Amino acid sequence: MTDIVLEPGAAPLSVWREIWRGAGVRLDPAAHAVVAQSAEAVTRILARGEPVYGINTGFGKLATVRIEDADLATLQRNLVLSHAAGVGEASPRAVVRLMMALKLASLAQGASGVRPVTVQLLERMIAQDLIPVVPGQGSVGASGDLAPLAHMAAAMLGVGEIETAGQRLPAGEALAAAGLAPLALGPKEGLALLNGTQFSTANALAGLFEAERLFRSALVTGALSTEAAKGSDTPFDARIHALRRQPGQVEAARALRELMAGSAIRASHLKDDERVQDPYCLRCQPQVMGAALDVLRQAAATLGFEANGVSDNPLIFAGDTNNGEDEALSGGNFHAEPVAFAADMIALAVCEIGSIAERRIAMLVDPALSGLPAFLTPKPGLNSGFMIPQVTAAALVSENKQLAHPASVDSIPTSANQEDHVSMAAHGARRLLAMTANLEGVVAIELLAAAQGCDFHAPLTSSEALERVRARLRRDVPSLDHDRHFAPDIAAAQAIVRAGELAFPDLPGVA
């Protein structure tokens, strides 16, 4: 995989998607000069002897405590070590790696006051696959993601653990083995590494990219379920959706039409079909999936801005680019409310994609609704067929309904009420990978059920696109002619979905 050259402040969503998938990262060399200017500005600001938050003062409620020049380096080290107070299971290394790339892009914009050596160490750690072990719990999404980013920063100091080559090693040992020296922090640098929304944003982007893959996959399984139930494609007619003018709905309807185009199964019941209208789970796919697509795109836009932004505090404006005056401005860019809202939107979309998919599975196993054998087995009674896979799908969907509760409506005061309103973005973003894992199971079960339903229509075949999907599944999972151990079938279908084999690139996506 080719390395991505990261242009701070100008990276499209596709860049973050490729980094999430494991692409290498190199910083645009032009960024180093901008970083150096920012660090020099911090030196000049300190020389003025003025109190500047986080540079020569305490933090949070202790911001009024002035720190002597001789203690400035100790101040930053103490900040990192004291804030590395996360708990819980380690975050997925792909998420931590993405977080590191986001932090690299933020620091490289020259508004954080760090030295080039600090940026270079972070860049080299990504390049050499030195990924800090970061506990998942401990951030409330303001002031930034302090605890998770502190664990990243601590690893740069040689404290904590680093995962590399499948091993967890003491951070100092891992750095030494890679030929890297632990960082000795300069003024402002500890705060610059800790302050920011990169943990929440990385988790939210990971959830978004997984949701995009599963959205596309669910369009395919939804079309296949429509075929299995001998549903109509009339509700997907372009004229219906043009009148409503909802962009996602228009695109979802077009995708369903194209997926079903040329189906012999559909042609077999164009006339003399007693059903005037299909159940909502078939008929309203464009409306539900289109709304989900629109919400995912809105979240993607928000996260795209956040990924390219600077969420540090205070921000350094170097005199070279600021009318000759060096300034350190305190603000609130660390507040992750935009990320929290985006994560909540993604959660709602993921929940609804699974909800309507489970309803299609339930319809397929019910002979009164689908016209297919009960529970999709040739000999119901002797065999239970898809009875319990549908229950599993229902369980996964119900779990996602609980997980979809908005995180952004919660807040709790911290730091002796100095930080009295927080976003809970980390909570909202962290749950997304659990939700998409649940959705993956639902989509996999629908793939199995829909393919099984189509088997009963032989020798009639579906469209060329959907027959390719069935053929791919049948390479790993034979048709269910009698009961067998079902878990391996679901696992095999999940592997197909996870590999993105249903997420055709010409289907609608977030960007």
Swiss-Prot record:
Keywords: Cytoplasm, Histidine metabolism, Lyase. Its EC number is 4.3.1.3. Gene3D superfamilies: Fumarase/aspartase (Central domain), Fumarase/aspartase (N-terminal domain). CDD domains: PAL-HAL. GO terms for molecular function: histidine ammonia-lyase activity. GO terms for biological process: L-histidine catabolic process to glutamate and formamide; L-histidine catabolic process to glutamate and formate. The modification 2,3-didehydroalanine (Ser) is found at residue 143. There is a cross-link at residues 142-144 (5-imidazolinone (Ala-Gly)). Contains an active site 4-methylidene-imidazol-5-one (MIO), which is formed autocatalytically by cyclization and dehydration of residues Ala-Ser-Gly. InterPro entries: Aromatic_Lyase, Fumarase/histidase_N, HutH, L-Aspartase-like, Phe/His_NH3-lyase_AS. Signal peptide: none annotated. It is found in: Cytoplasm. Its main location: cytoplasm. SUPFAM superfamilies: L-aspartase-like. Pfam families: Lyase_aromatic. Pathway: Amino-acid degradation; L-histidine degradation into L-glutamate; N-formimidoyl-L-glutamate from L-histidine: step 1/3. It catalyses: L-histidine = trans-urocanate + NH4(+). It comes from the Bacteria. GO terms for cellular component: cytoplasm. Belongs to the PAL/histidase family. PANTHER family: HISTIDINE AMMONIA-LYASE (PTHR10362). This is Histidine ammonia-lyase. It comes from Phenylobacterium zucineum (strain HLK1). The lineage of its organism: Bacteria, Pseudomonadati, Pseudomonadota, Alphaproteobacteria, Caulobacterales.
